Amino acid sequence: MAKKSSIEKNNRRKKMTKNAAPKRARLKAIIADKDLPMEERFAATLKLAEMPRNSSATRIRNRCEITGRARSVYRLNKLSRIAIRDLGSKGLVPGLVKSSW
């Protein structure tokens, strides 16, 4: 089980990213627009740099929904390999069978 502080920190980052996404998108569009004057694009770059780091989507860590584990998490179902194995052995994951050959 991951530390509760790590899980909460990641949840705060998700919330902050969701709130700041439209503003970040606008600033990035201004920066990428080659038709605008260089001063305006540079000002947008400075505004983007002033935004909180945690409002960037790259700061979010994929974590297991059950255990909070950060490594070996499958994006499809948001579960770690350990959680999938436990649920599969209990028969809670449809179609998952123990392999034998």
Curated annotation (Swiss-Prot):
GO CC terms, sorted: cytoplasm; small ribosomal subunit
Keyword Ribonucleoprotein in record: yes
Region (Disordered): 1-23
Gene Ontology process terms (BP): translation
One MF annotation (Gene Ontology) recorded for this entry: structural constituent of ribosome
Alphabetical UniProt keywords: Ribonucleoprotein, Ribosomal protein, RNA-binding, rRNA-binding
Protein family per UniProt: Belongs to the universal ribosomal protein uS14 family.
Role summary: Binds 16S rRNA, required for the assembly of 30S particles and may also be responsible for determining the conformation of the 16S rRNA at the A site.
Protein name: Small ribosomal subunit protein uS14
Organism of provenance: Rhodopseudomonas palustris (strain HaA2)
